[in-house]
Each structure stands twice: as C-alpha cells, then as structure tokens.
C-alpha cells in the first residue's frame, strides 16, 4: 500500500495552476495519486460483496434456518449500520474512512487556503496536521452521507426501478394512476447519469491537479484528499508539561491504577497495528479464495456438461419391437397398417405412424405404443365416456 504513497505527484512540477499560491507553489504536493484513491474505492465496493459471498456459501448453506436466512435477506441493512459506526469513528478520530486509512489516505478541509499553502511551504508541516485543516462537523456528516446513506438509498431505488421495469414488460395495461411510476422511470435514471457525469468531471479536475476532491459533494464542501499525517490536538500545551514531573509518586490505589492504565494504553495501538497488517492480507486471501471456488465450480459444471455429451443408451425394447425391427422396410412403413406412412405423426416413444392409424390404435389398446407396447403418458381414460382419449400422446409432422 505504501508503494503508491511514494510515487511522485504529477502536479508537483506544474506551475501557475488554479491552486497556486505564494511563489507559484500550490496544493499539488498534498494530493495523493489517483491509483491510491481508485484502489481504495474498489476495495470499499468489493468488501460487502465478499462478506455476503462468505455468508451465503458457508453460514446459510451449512446452517439453513430462519435466522440465517433473515441475516442474509437483510444483509445490506445491518452491514451498512455496522459500517456506519466504524466509518464515523474513523472520521471523528482520524479524518479518514476505514478503507482509506489502510491505504494511507486522509481527508482535509481546504476552506482555509492560506493555511494549506503554509503547510506546503513549511517543512515542519510534514510532521503534524494543524487543527484548521481538519474536517469540521458538517464535512464529516457529508462524508458519512456519501459513504453510508447515499449508497443505501441508491441500492433501494435501483431495486424499485428494476421491479417497475419488469412489471411494465409483463403487463401491457397502462392507466392514468401510474403516472408517478412513469415519472420515476424517466427522472431517476437521468439524475443518476447526471451525478455520475458530475463525479467524472471532478475526477478529471483531480487528474489536472486543480482540486483534491474526487466527487461532487467533496468539491462543493471543500473536502480534499491527502496522505496520512498525525493530527494536532487542541490542547497541544499539555504536551510540553508531559513528562516534566519526575518526582517520586505515592504508591496508593489511584497511582497504581493510573500506572496500570498507562501500561495498558499500548493495547489499542497494538490492535490497530495488527489490524493494519491483517486487513490487506484478509482482502487478498478473500479474493484468492473466491477465484479458487469459482474455478472449482467451473470445473464441476464442465464435467457435468461432458457427462451429458456422452452417448445415451437406447431404451430396452420388448420382444414384439425386436421382431418388428427385423422386418424389411419397417422404417418406411406404418407399424399399425404396415403400409407407407400417410399423414405422418410421431408418438411419445419416437416412432412414426399414420395419424388415423395411431389414433385408432391408441384408443382401442388403452394407450399403448404399437411398437414398444409402452403406456403413453398423453393417453388418459375418460370416466364419463368410459373411453380412452389421446390428449398429448402424438404430434403431427409437416413434411
């Protein structure tokens, strides 16, 4: 992941851009490469599909009950709820989303342009991120809306659009009370394409290093991308007094508790480090596992297709059919009248006979084939007329 962070920015050598400030230096050194952002967005979109794949193929398939089925049915709802808590924690703590943080990405507020330019010019700006460039509450809410709420609403609207489209295909009646559905079919795809085009234009501006935003909402609310930097605290004065008191402390319960708390504070940092190492590995293993299972399923399907292509054995024939097959010219003669077939039809057993002969024979012989003597499924007995009837036992041939 750190490979992309070490790539030189294409806009660092450009001068006189719209983001330029003092001495011709702009905000280009702050922006990451487009590869980092696209990789992060791709993983963010693949993560729910991968988790649902594991849930459906292992938990639901091995333990099918009403709880696991409901868990799979309402997957998008509870997954978005959990993701919302995780994303809000990371936005509040790190000014970054869960996936972006593992790619070394961070969001900052570009409303104070002079402070951002000072951060580029000041060599010490690489050490910590000032409070004025951190996201405010409104900008964090916008990112939460873009990452959590809007994808959920879009997914539900896509489902409604698909249902309405399918209903219009299979139902031809159009009444006046369906005008909201017709308006939705016209307006929603147009708005969706318009937003996609707007996001594409913002990405083109990002490629030209005119902005650090990659979406329309980020561009409107002055939210831009940068690489991860430590955030400065509002109470930075406490850092100067920390560690100055080297006097002996009293060994009472409070001091012992404070000492243990200080020693245990390393656990969250350790868990964060392990998570940063485990998450990329988990994503890689998950993709390999999906590829492996897909290849295995493809092999099984190909094997089944090959088994179907094998020669199908002929069905067993009765002694009467064997005698009939030995007769000369049986393939061109009707098995009932033993003459040349006129007005041909085919029976369920695959043999051809004259249509009048076949009807007469089947009715008088309780629906049995004249060649194999097998009962035809298309011949039924009518209890009202006390006669056998040919329903679907034969088919006319057009020659």
UniProtKB/Swiss-Prot annotation:
Residue span of region Disordered: 1-24
State which pathway it belongs to.
Protein modification; protein ubiquitination
**ZnF region ranges: RING-type:** 334-373
Give the subcellular location: Peroxisome membrane
An example of a GO molecular function for this protein is: protein transmembrane transporter activity
Instruction: Give binding positions for Zn(2+).
Output: 334, 337, 354, 357
Tree of life domain = Eukaryota
Q: Which UniProt keywords apply?
A: Membrane, Metal-binding, Peroxisome, Protein transport, Transmembrane, Transmembrane helix, Transport, Ubl conjugation pathway, Zinc, Zinc-finger
State which ranges are Peroxisomal matrix (membrane side).
1-33, 93-136, 209-277
Q: How does it sit in the membrane?
A: Multi-pass membrane protein
Compositional bias (Low complexity) at which positions? Answer: 9-24
Cellular component GO terms, alphabetically? peroxisomal importomer complex; peroxisomal membrane; transmembrane transporter complex; ubiquitin ligase complex
Predominantly, its location class is: membrane
Q: Where are the transmembrane segments?
A: 34-62, 68-92, 137-168, 172-208, 278-305
Membrane side Cytoplasmic: residue ranges: 63-67, 169-171, 306-399
Question: What's an example GO BP annotation here?
Answer: protein import into peroxisome matrix, substrate release
Similarity comment: family membership: Belongs to the pex2/pex10/pex12 family.
Q: What else is known?
A: Present with 907 molecules/cell in log phase SD medium.
Any idea what job this protein has? Component of a retrotranslocation channel required for peroxisome organization by mediating export of the PEX5 receptor from peroxisomes to the cytosol, thereby promoting PEX5 recycling. The retrotranslocation channel is composed of PEX2, PEX10 and PEX12; each subunit contributing transmembrane segments that coassemble into an open channel that specifically allows the passage of PEX5 through the peroxisomal membrane. PEX12 also regulates PEX5 recycling by activating the E3 ubiquitin-protein ligase activity of PEX10.
Assembly information from the UniProt record = Component of the PEX2-PEX10-PEX12 retrotranslocation channel, composed of PEX2, PEX10 and PEX12.
The entry's free-text remark on domains says: The three subunits of the retrotranslocation channel (PEX2, PEX10 and PEX12) coassemble in the membrane into a channel with an open 10 Angstrom pore. The RING-type zinc-fingers that catalyze PEX5 receptor ubiquitination are positioned above the pore on the cytosolic side of the complex.
This chain belongs to which protein, by name? Peroxisome assembly protein 12
Q: Which organism is it from?
A: Saccharomyces cerevisiae (strain ATCC 204508 / S288c)
Source species taxonomy: Eukaryota, Fungi, Dikarya, Ascomycota, Saccharomycotina
Gene assigned in the entry: PEX12
